[in-house]
């Protein structure tokens, strides 16, 4: 069912779920700070790791860091914490990450949520899913540090910084973001495990402002597991966890 939803009333998430929220490119685990207490107050466990090269792991940034590194980060956390029945949420670039994670440990994943995210097929890279990504790689290649892409610049309203326009929020976000390794955008997704197909999926699209050049693949009406697609929309910019944390949390709990 395709819907625009602002205040869902029925909660269908189990009494206690495990949410694993994976940030996108340039960000780190702190971007979920406004969402975490809302999910925890509803009785759920929440994990918001920073991937290698970001946040508390920024010192590990190197040319060798790639998509596979980030997949290993999440799989390792799942095993170390012995997590099962995980609601795995991937924002933006992390749509690639959660796809490969599900491919490795499908038995531990209860639900996949693609949050304004790249939705790949097996063997695809970020460039395949979002062609404008190649422009960022080319730009990096002409710099002194060809192996990494600096954070995107703030754009004039209504686009702002990743869809964030409030000055205080922009300043907070600007202090958080860091360079993105090019290898993350070039390594292919592994999505060839048939067991992944049975995992239900939800897609949440941020439709408030969409800069030119950004494309979104249509979501098939039927999920791989045969059930109707679940697609929700939020009338805000890309970083909805910052601009609409309450509404996002309501969707995650639905």
Q: How would you describe each model-predicted region?
A:
Residues 45, 51-87, 103-104, 126-131:
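Active-site loop/oxyanion-hole signature of alpha/beta-hydrolase fold enzymes
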Residues 242-254:
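Post-His helix in hydrolase/transferase enzymes
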Residues 207-235, 239-242:
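Conserved loop-alpha-helix segment in the C-terminal half of the alpha/beta-hydrolase fold
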Residues 103, 108-109, 113-154, 184-185, ...:
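Flexible "cap/lid" loop of the alpha/beta hydrolase fold
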Residues 175-194:
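Active-site nucleophile elbow and catalytic-triad environment of alpha/beta-hydrolase enzymes
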Residues 90, 94, 98:
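Gly/Ala-rich beta-loop-alpha elbow adjacent to hydrolase catalytic centers
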Residues 17-58:
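Conserved HGGG/HGGXW glycine-rich cap/lid loop of the alpha/beta-hydrolase fold
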């Amino acid at each position: 069912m395709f819907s625009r939803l602002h205040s869902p009333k029925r909660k269908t998430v189990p009494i206690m779920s495990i949410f694993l929220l994976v940030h996108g490119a340039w960000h780190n685990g702190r971007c979920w700070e406004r969402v975490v207490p809302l999910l925890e107050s509803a009785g759920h466990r929440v994990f918001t790791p920073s991937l290698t090269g970001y946040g508390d792991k920024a010192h590990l940034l190197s040319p060798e860091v790639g998509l596979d590194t980030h997949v290993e980060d999440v799989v390792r956390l799942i095993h170390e914490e012995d997590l099962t029945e995980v609601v795995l949420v991937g924002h933006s670039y992390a749509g690639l990450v959660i796809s490969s994670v599900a491919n490795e440990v499908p038995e531990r994943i209860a639900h996949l949520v693609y949050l304004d995210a790249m939705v790949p097929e097996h063997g695809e890279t970020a460039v395949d899913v979002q062609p404008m990504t190649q422009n960022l790689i080319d730009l990096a290649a002409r710099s002194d540090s060809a192996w990494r892409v600096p954070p995107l610049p703030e754009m004039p309203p209504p686009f702002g910084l990743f869809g964030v326009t409030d000055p205080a929020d922009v300043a907070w976000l600007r202090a958080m973001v860091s360079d993105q390794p090019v290898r993350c955008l070039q390594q292919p997704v592994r999505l060839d495990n048939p067991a992944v197909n049975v995992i239900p999926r939800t897609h949440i699209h941020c439709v408030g402002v969409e800069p030119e050049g950004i494309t979104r693949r249509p979501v098939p009406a039927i999920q791989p597991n045969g059930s109707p697609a679940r697609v929700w929309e939020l009338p805000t910019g890309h970083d909805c966890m910052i601009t609409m944390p309450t509404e996002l949390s309501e969707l995650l709990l639905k």
